């Protein structure tokens, strides 16, 4: 609402200060979160047993949205993968809490006219700025080559995508959608209970549109 002089409740400098404060608090939280993750990695926890259903899967590639190698440590089928078949798309934290990570808002929420000032809080910009691992994009090229040489478009083995421990939140739509759109892909999503299944289904509908 403007007053009789055509001015709003905040002057331009005041509004800019509020924006700067919000952004600084967001990145202060991310900094504390990274320290917490590094600390958690040093804590000795009771040994966990792998889930047999997951452990029996033949894993050729591993895409992680987490920041730690917990899955690789727990599941032997993934621990032997070569580095080119492992991708920490949001960054990886081991002992260095200063390593950059992606933690922000999804690209679907970005409006260049409204959000330009907050660009640095969006995941797609953070991936660009921090040069996080996007090796998974090369996997699609390998898949297309494999299927192009297979008789009648059928490869020797099925192209299976297993999703475990991800909420399918639309903030990661730009990474998840290519998997769902890949021809001949068989998508398997693991869930904990019926409530989590319903939540996953809702998010999946948002991703697929």
Regions from the language model: what does each represent?
Residues 114-142, 192-206:
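Catalytic lobes of large eukaryotic enzymes
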Residues 148-209:
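SIR2/sirtuin-family catalytic core signature
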Residues 79-80, 139-156:
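Short, conserved, surface-exposed binding loops centered on an aromatic residue
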Residues 1-134:
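Extended, H/D-rich, highly charged conserved domains that either
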Residues 43-44, 64, 141-143, 168-169:
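A conditional alpha-helix N-cap/helix-loop micro-motif detector
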